[in-house]
Amino acid sequence: MHLKKIAIIRCLKTSASCAGAGCLRAFYEKDKAFALYGEEELRLMAMWTCNGCGDSMLENQEGIRKKIERMKALEIDALHLSHCTSKKDEQGEKHLCPTIKAIADELADCGIKIVQGTH
């Protein structure tokens, strides 16, 4: 059975008040979005944040390039987009953050599976 290499990306703004415990619990218990792997062996290769957007954008934006290149070098099988990477609009509909979408699109173009959600 093939070992699945998994990474989780989360929102920089949310990480100020979130320890990531829900994402990690779901991963280790193969619950919620990780249930799709069934009995496959998983390895968490990275749990990382974007470099922000709007007022929270980090000055060093070249760091995000390093993170993206690291994901490619690790040859991850799937990138899970944490629950916090989508926000509700005024009508209550969830939309993926444009910054996260750009990162996910680039990694998807390299053959990495993008999975919406963690817990």
Predicted regions and their residues:
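Conserved mixed alpha/beta catalytic, RNA-binding, or beta-rich assembly cores of soluble enzyme
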Residues: 1-71, 92-96, 113
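Hydrophobic, Leu/Ile/Phe/Ala-enriched alpha-helical segments that form helix-helix packing faces
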Residues: 68-71, 103, 107
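Oxyanion-hole/transition-state-stabilizing segment in secreted/luminal serine hydrolases
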Residues: 85-87
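Short Gly/Thr/Asp-enriched flexible loops that form oxyanion-binding sites at enzyme active sites
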Residues: 90-106
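Divalent-metal-activated hydrolytic enzyme cores
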Residues: 108-119
